[in-house]
């Protein structure tokens, strides 16, 4: 079973249109990351690659369109 560290609103993530990743600072010093396509496919968990903590991304599917417009 997954253990979710926190729930974070999508507006609190930074979006990089080049990598198409949403990122958010992790307590370990690295960053949680999830791709816009994963979110669009219904995957709402961002994982830190360094410490494996996970956060749930809170968003509505229509929120993603403004980010797709940046790509």
From Swiss-Prot:
InterPro entries: DPH3/4-like (IPR044248), DPH_MB_dom (IPR007872), DPH_MB_sf (IPR036671). GO terms for biological process: protein histidyl modification to diphthamide; tRNA wobble base 5-methoxycarbonylmethyl-2-thiouridinylation. The keyword Cytoplasm applies. Pathway: Protein modification; peptidyl-diphthamide biosynthesis. Residues 4-60 form the DPH-type MB domain. Its main location: cytoplasm. One of its GO terms (molecular function) is oxidoreductase activity. The keyword rRNA-binding does not apply. It comes from the Eukaryota. PROSITE patterns: DPH_MB. Keywords: Cytoplasm, Iron, Metal-binding, Nucleus, Oxidoreductase. One of its GO terms (cellular component) is nucleus. It catalyses: [3Fe-4S](1+)-[protein] + Fe(2+)-[Dph3] = [3Fe-4S](0)-[protein] + Fe(3+)-[Dph3]; 2 [3Fe-4S](0)-[protein] + 2 Fe(2+)-[Dph3] + NADH = 2 [4Fe-4S](1+)-[protein] + 2 [Dph3] + NAD(+) + H(+). Its cofactor is Fe(2+). It is found in: Cytoplasm; Nucleus. Fe cation binds at residues 26, 28, 48, 51. Component of the 2-(3-amino-3-carboxypropyl)histidine synthase complex composed of DPH1, DPH2, DPH3 and a NADH-dependent reductase, predominantly CBR1. Belongs to the DPH3 family. Required for the first step of diphthamide biosynthesis, a post-translational modification of histidine which occurs in elongation factor 2. DPH1 and DPH2 transfer a 3-amino-3-carboxypropyl (ACP) group from S-adenosyl-L-methionine (SAM) to a histidine residue, the reaction is assisted by a reduction system comprising KTI11/DPH3 and a NADH-dependent reductase, predominantly CBR1. Acts as an electron donor to reduce the Fe-S cluster in DPH1-DPH2 keeping the [4Fe-4S] clusters in the active and reduced state. The DPH-type metal-binding (MB) domain can also bind zinc. However, iron is the physiological binding partner as zinc binding impairs the protein electron donor function. This is Diphthamide biosynthesis protein 3.
């Amino acid at each position: 079973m997954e253990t979710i560290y926190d729930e974070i609103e999508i507006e609190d993530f930074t979006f990089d249109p080049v990598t198409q990743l949403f990122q958010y600072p992790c307590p370990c010093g690295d960053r949680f990351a999830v791709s816009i396509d994963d979110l669009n496919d219904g995957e709402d968990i961002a994982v830190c690659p360094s410490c494996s903590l996970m956060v749930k991304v809170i968003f509505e599917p229509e929120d993603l369109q403004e980010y797709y417009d940046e790509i």
